[in-house]
Amino acid sequence: MEEKPRLIDSFLFRAALIFVLLLPVLLRRDLTPTNEMKYLEIADEALRDGHFWCLFHNGEMYADKPPLYIWIVMLFRRLLGCHCAFLLELFSLVPAIVTLWVLERWCSEELSSRWRAAASLSLMTCAWFLGSAIVLRMDMLMTMFITLSLWTFWKMYTGRATPADRWLFPLYVFLAIFSKGPVGIMIPLLCIPVFLLFERRFRFMGTVWGWRSWLLLAALCGIWWFFVWREGGSEYLNNLLFHQTAGRAVNAFHHKEPVYYYCYTVWYAMAPWSLIAIPVAFLPLFKRVEASPMVRFLLAVAASFFVIMSLVSGKIAVYLLPIFGPLCFASCILLQRMEDGGSRTAVILRRIMLWGSLLILAAAFVIGLFFPGWLNSLL
């Protein structure tokens, strides 16, 4: 017997609900001095000194991040004459909602509306995902572009891509790089071939990473690096390309952690839904449930990126943000297959994920409305 559709099953309703419940948090919290205020200061310094491609903080080079997010801060500073934290926070919240929409649209052929609701709300309320959706950082922007690139790859892989998708794929990859740096290319370049190897279709790499992808990526990066060199000279370009990439990967000068760091941080970074998503992700290994090609791809991306980032010297929990979506949605597809097979446990878990997520969002509303000081201490 089919269940009647509910209001919560509508993506537009869920998106509006997320926005309304997080609105007090967005309006009443204070900006953090270590990261958020620093980005505003970098934007002010760039506007004052006429820098556009090269970033500086208190006169010192700040090649840690590409300029895209700072450009957004600069744009609103120029338009409004002051910084508006609420508008800037939307450039984290809106990409988070777009990421949910992409994953729901992508997985709609394997997930019912009820399971899509559970998957997207549980992803939204993962600790680090929710936190990244309300702070002034570029991580969610990068996650959105990575998710778009993965969806575009899947359309190419399954023969559903339009001619434009062959150009959109490298464009999304570039925008991910331009948002956060080299971590933006790691999933499309390193994790996709892992999946293709397991599927014995490695030759498809020539279609995904063919001449169009490399041409557009080289052209856009070349333009960026040329203007960086023109404005900041060889020293800034060297800092951007080598010190901030190879230095962080091999012998990090910031956030250096042991190789097993993510083995324990992933549990609280995805909390509370790591307790469901991660164990369920291992079920196909034990033949408890069959994994479709889509699930295999999502899990291959999550597993390979986890291993790759564990081998990188510099580690922060938020670096795992791009794999939260694949993990949550893959686990929900597996749970729905179990429910279709008569599993009562899967039904219970779906309800826990749905109502637990709504409870977390309601708690965020109350805290933002009545206890903003406590929220500031958390961030």
Placement of each model-derived feature along the sequence:
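Membrane-integral, polyisoprenol-dependent glycosyltransferases
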Residues: 1-344, 371
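Transmembrane helical bundles and short interhelical boundary loops of multi-pass, membrane-embedded
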Residues: 347-379
